[in-house]
């Protein structure tokens, strides 16, 4: 454990950030799984609805630095292509 006051504060802040980021990461993964489940079921309408809900979440995570912007773009591109292939 840190002895210096500023180091203690940094430890508390980083733990708070870690928990917050874990929550956001979990939320993002859940939304991606919902889209993939809808694609797997073959229901294009529900897949599009889930994708529409997941897209702003993915973008927000990229903006906040939780995931890289290229990773966000890759996720959206691949999911979109899979939904298009359902037709």
Curated annotation (Swiss-Prot):
Signal peptide: none annotated. One of its GO terms (cellular component) is small ribosomal subunit. The keyword Ribosomal protein applies. Keywords: Ribonucleoprotein, Ribosomal protein, RNA-binding, rRNA-binding. InterPro entries: Ribosomal_bS20, Ribosomal_bS20_sf. Residues 1-27 have a biased composition (Basic residues). Residues 1-31 are annotated as: Disordered. It comes from the Bacteria. GO terms for molecular function: small ribosomal subunit rRNA binding; structural constituent of ribosome. GO terms for biological process: translation. HAMAP family: Ribosomal_bS20. Belongs to the bacterial ribosomal protein bS20 family. NCBIfam families: S20. Binds directly to 16S ribosomal RNA. This is Small ribosomal subunit protein bS20. The gene is rpsT.
């Amino acid at each position: 454990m840190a002895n210096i006051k500023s180091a203690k504060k940094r430890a508390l802040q980083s733990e708070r950030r870690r928990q917050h980021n874990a929550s956001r990461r979990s939320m993002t993964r859940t939304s991606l799984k919902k889209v993939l489940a809808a694609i797997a079921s073959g229901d294009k309408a529900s897949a599009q609805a889930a994708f529409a809900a997941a897209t702003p979440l993915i973008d927000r995570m990229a903006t906040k630095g939780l995931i890289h912007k290229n990773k966000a773009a890759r996720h959206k591109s691949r999911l979109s292509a899979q939904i298009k292939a359902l037709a």
